[in-house]
Amino acid sequence: MQVLRHSEHTLKTALLSKNPVLVSQYEKLDAGEQRLMNEAFQPRSNLFEPITVHSQSDWISSHPEAPQDFEQFFSDRYRKAPCPKKHIIYIQSIGSLGNTRVISEEYIKWLKGYCEAFFYGLKVKFLEPVSVSETKCSFRVNEHTQNLQIHTGHILAFLKKNKPEDAFCIVGITMIDLYPRDSWNFVFGQASLSSGVGIFSFARYGKDFYTSKYEGNVTSLQLTSPTDYSIFDNYYIPEITSVLLLRSCKTLTHEIGHILGLRHCQWLACLMQGSNHLEESDRRPLNVCPICLRKLQSAIGFNIVERYRALVKWIDDESCNESGATPKSSSEHAHLPKPVEAFKDWREWLMRCIALLEK
């Protein structure tokens, strides 16, 4: 394992900038907000840790990228920020998200609430669900994993065409696996920053995807026609566990972060780190580092302690059931408890941040 540890000077410059105007902006922040963000360059911080690289297959090793500091983010003339006329994050579900209508609806509410807390100050709305056939996307059976996949480029085109006028962005979510081109095995998600659209799949976040017990396998023989979407009827949907909900929240906020102009983080352990595989994605924290937090705050304009309190409230609202998973059928509960036990460590982290902000 390799630990990527930057110097105090490097991290401080990445956060504050060398530009006197941006430094002055930073110095005008609330004292508590400065205290929290200054943790970025504290060697013994117990809130923000260095990035660890565990193998050559990790993102940083296999996808070399130039880092983006706050000044580069702020001065990016191609970056799009929310404005009064375009200030809503729209989420479009594609295909069923749960095994019943009730489960799908509750899952959507949980994701909406999380996004509203994470991007505190922006509105989040869900569009009416659409079927795979309505997108007219290409699809295939993955020759390695034998599961159905839909084409990201075609989905992005569909989303762009149906993007509401007041949308800052529109993101599609699905429980069906994705592929961007024939030569690729899969992709967790894909976004177009210039168009403000993205598509993300949670198919691989189920507990059985990488096991022999996975129930979503099909054969190429079942594909009667490249336009026969009936193969998606009653297609396997993973159970909404607490871990799947956490992974979904991570992916959704990571990708919307990209649409807001945040590139992959290479400063500290951060939600905005790139990930090549599920194990690496699971290592990423739910929180953004101080450098990326300043970027988000600059783009949206939230009060940090209010944002953290909103995230704690999302976790606390509706305690989860003991099993940490949604019921198998809608008849078990008319109103499903939110499975949040996987978020408990993060809640403790948020409370430590709030204490520091209010010190």
Swiss-Prot record:
Can you tell me which residues bind Zn(2+) 2?
A: C265, C270, C289, C292
Which InterPro entries does UniProt cross-reference here?
Answer: Archaemetzincin, MetalloPept_cat_dom_sf, Pept_M54_archaemetzincn
Keyword set, alphabetical order? Hydrolase, Metal-binding, Metalloprotease, Protease, Zinc
Q: Does the keyword Aminoacyl-tRNA synthetase apply?
A: no
The cofactors it requires, by name, are:
Zn(2+)
Indicate which residues the UniProt annotation says bind Zn(2+) 1. H254, H258, H264
> Keyword Phosphoprotein, does the record have it?
no
Per UniProt, what is one GO molecular function of this protein?
A: metallopeptidase activity
Q: How is the cofactor bound?
A: Binds 2 Zn(2+) ions per subunit. One is catalytic, whereas the other seems to have a structural role.
Provide the free-text tissue specificity comment from this protein's UniProt record: Predominantly expressed in testis.
Entry EC no(s): 3.4.-.-
Catalytic positions are E255 (proton acceptor)
What's any GO biological process attached to this entry? Answer: proteolysis
Tell me the protein family, please. Answer: Belongs to the peptidase M54 family.
Q: What does this protein do?
A: Probable zinc metalloprotease.
- Quote the protein name from its UniProt record: Archaemetzincin-2
Q: What species is this protein from?
A: Mus musculus (Mouse)
* Organism phylogeny: Eukaryota, Metazoa, Chordata, Craniata, Vertebrata
